[in-house]
UniProtKB/Swiss-Prot annotation:
Keywords: Coiled coil, Ion transport, Magnesium, Membrane, Transmembrane, Transmembrane helix, Transport
InterPro entries per the UniProt record, alphabetical: MRS2-like
Highest classification ranks of the organism: Eukaryota, Viridiplantae, Streptophyta, Embryophyta, Tracheophyta
GO CC terms of this entry: membrane
Pfam families for the chain: MRS2-like
Originating gene: MRS2-E
UniProt name for this protein: Magnesium transporter MRS2-E
Subcellular localization(s) per the UniProt record: Membrane
Amino acid sequence: MERRAQPVSAAVAPVTGRRKGAAASRKWMVVPAVGEERRVEFGKHQIMKMTGLPGRDLRVLDPVLSYPSTILGRDRAIVVRLQGVKAIITATEVLVPDHDDVLLASFLLDLRSRLSLPDAAPSTNPAAADRGNGTEQGDQGSVPGLAISGAGNAKIPPFEFKVLEVCLEHACKDLESQTRSLEKEAYPALDKLGSKVSTLNLDHVRNLKSRMVDLSGRVQKIRDELEHLLDDDMDMSEMYLTRKLSFQGLSGSLSRADSHKYASVDHDDDREEEDHDDETESGRESSVYVKPDIEELEMLLEAYFVQIDGTLNTLYHIREYADDTEDYINIMLDEKQNQLLQMGVMLTTATVVVTAGIVVVSLFGMNIHIDLMKDPETPEMVRMSNMHFWETTFGTVAGCIAIYLLAIYAGRKSKILQ
């Protein structure tokens, strides 16, 4: 029995390993700056090696985990999770998790249309082509979409900003569309509830308020994320991937040129070395206080910040209208409750008065020796007895009515009743 159990466990082990390997890899849609898009299956460690991202940043894109909207700028990539848009943006390509989703198909369609525009092609800068030697040209030419101004003043936005703009535009349009749909449905439902309070209308408004709270939370999160980026210049500077890539190439070329140029320089003059060190140190200190050039990204984020803030204001107005409708309904219900309480007071007063009349009738029903209770002996006494009966009856009723009216008057005078 033991010999038979060993091959089974050995056969199960490779299957488990393959399952773990399959679970660690995912399909990605790779859209490069130049070339055709392709579907590739990458593992987690491959993505980390390609983009330089830590594992915690990749968990932001995990469809199983629930993460809020996030934009993370890293050294070699930008991680974006906005609504249904999930992407890893580098200086040369964008990686999108491949799964069957309507939002993903719409996002890829918008991305293709944006990258197919004339400014989406790799920039061929004539001024840069005439500059320097072949090494510098090769370093600059290897970076697609490099945002270096040519003869004109306009700059071509780098590839990562084009993709980031598509992500922001897609998320903002989706939230704005949901807000407009909610607005068209909310105002008539609230007006209908204000005119007629019913269980069906209350349930409809409750569902609308749940949608509004959920939508407001998502819009608020994107707004806070954009506000956080706009407040931090260093975070925005980290998102200039193409610039950092080009600076790495230029710094490598300059370092090689400097090493060749100053290889034969005499370093015996200590004074020149001290002056050079002082200038370098002062340059470093002054560079700390220089604001990075982030105007292009700042304008992009501000535009979508204004748009998402307008969407949030629309939701705020809907919430205010819902609160006003709720206050109006509460006032109506309070008025109805006051009317019922007044009716209860009037009915209680009438009950007390009628009870007093019944007590009077009970007193007259007792066997007491008074002239009113004597049996009439003559027709004249019969007539007088009948007249006394009706006088007593009408007097009792009139007295009860008078007491009731007096009680109502006292209640109105004391403003207990309206």
